[in-house]
């Protein structure tokens, strides 16, 4: 597919992607000075920009040098989500990961992650965390550099109370993923009241529910939907899908073109949320962590597809390729 002068954002997201093969931009001789004065609605995330976000890791570093993140979620029958989120956070380079999950799945989660600290939270009879689930070791959220809540959590009323409590208490960057978004009522006004930076990572269906719209409306203009979600919540919004868009107040929205249809499987969103919280834990700002996270996840997914095929790859295969992407981006 040939486009003239500059990429067009309609070719990079939603149904436009289906009409594009290998995209080639043809130079028409437009002056760079002229292009500098063009106001583009969307920027493309590129490898050089992402790599520049990561500094040298000091030789005298210790595990605390690279941050400590807390991940809350999991439930009976859905413990794999929090395992993948935690593993992705660790592979992103964060120094420490603590996990809280219901007591009934604690042993399975702990056995799946030798490098994470796993705490058992009190649970309801349906196997989800209770509002007063807090284990002694994680009650002080200020002890962490970032928090992720939602993977595999469930959508029962108790889960909503858990999410509300965390939003009210959290003072460090907070990622709301999956069920931490699904428990909100239409156009919930709690998120804008948060005293911490909030990152939301919805797929189109989750954003449609949150915004009280239909999925077709979200997908018809993903950029506008993202902007409206930012305006409604004051959060950084990561609208997942083909041509993932990241938007935040005061920032120009960006679109990501790494990734492939093989990533359209259960668990891929948990991997992305884990990468983003891991990058937040290492000190990246919310918008930077979000745009770097979607690029890294997509590029790792592309590597996994080359190894295994799009049809045969799984979400956990994306995690296996994160270290190689980090080495390519950072040179070490």
Task: Kindly give the residue locations of the regions a language model identified.
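Small-residue (G/A/S/T)-rich helix-start motifs and N-terminal tracts that mark the onset
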Residues: 6, 11-174, 178, 182-199, ...
């Amino acid at each position: 597919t040939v486009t003239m002068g500059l990429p067009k954002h309609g070719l990079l997201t939603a149904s436009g992607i289906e009409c594009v093969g290998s995209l080639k931009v043809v130079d028409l001789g437009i002056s760079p000075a002229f292009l500098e004065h063009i106001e583009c609605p969307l920027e493309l995330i590129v490898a050089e920009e992402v790599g520049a976000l990561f500094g040298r890791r000091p030789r005298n570093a210790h595990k605390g040098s690279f941050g400590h993140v807390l991940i809350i979620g999991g439930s009976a029958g859905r413990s794999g989500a929090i395992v993948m989120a935690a593993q992705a956070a660790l592979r992103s380079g964060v120094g420490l990961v603590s996990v809280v999950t219901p007591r009934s799945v604690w042993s399975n989660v702990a056995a799946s992650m030798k490098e994470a600290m796993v705490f058992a939270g009190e649970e309801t009879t349906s196997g989800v965390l209770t509002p007063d689930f807090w284990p002694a070791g994680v009650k002080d959220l200020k002890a962490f550099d970032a928090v992720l809540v939602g993977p595999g959590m469930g959508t029962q009323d108790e889960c909503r109370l858990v999410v509300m409590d965390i939003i009210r208490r959290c003072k460090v960057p907070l990622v709301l993923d999956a069920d931490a978004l699904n428990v909100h009522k239409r156009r919930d006004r709690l998120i804008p009241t948060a005293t911490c930076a909030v990152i939301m990572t919805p797929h189109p269906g989750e954003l449609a529910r949150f915004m009280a719209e239909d999925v077709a409306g979200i997908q018809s203009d993903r950029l506008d939907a993202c902007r409206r979600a930012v305006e409604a919540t004051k959060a950084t919004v990561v609208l997942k899908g083909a041509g993932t868009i990241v938007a935040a107040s005061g920032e120009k929205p960006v679109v990501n073109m790494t990734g492939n249809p093989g990533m359209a499987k259960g668990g891929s969103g948990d991997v992305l949320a884990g990468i983003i919280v891991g990058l937040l834990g290492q000190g990246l700002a919310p918008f930077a962590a979000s745009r770097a996270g979607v690029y890294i996840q997509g590029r790792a997914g592309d590597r996994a597809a080359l190894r295994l095929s799009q049809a045969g790859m799984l979400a956990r295969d994306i995690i296996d390729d994160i270290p190689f992407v980090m080495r390519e981006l950072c040179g070490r």
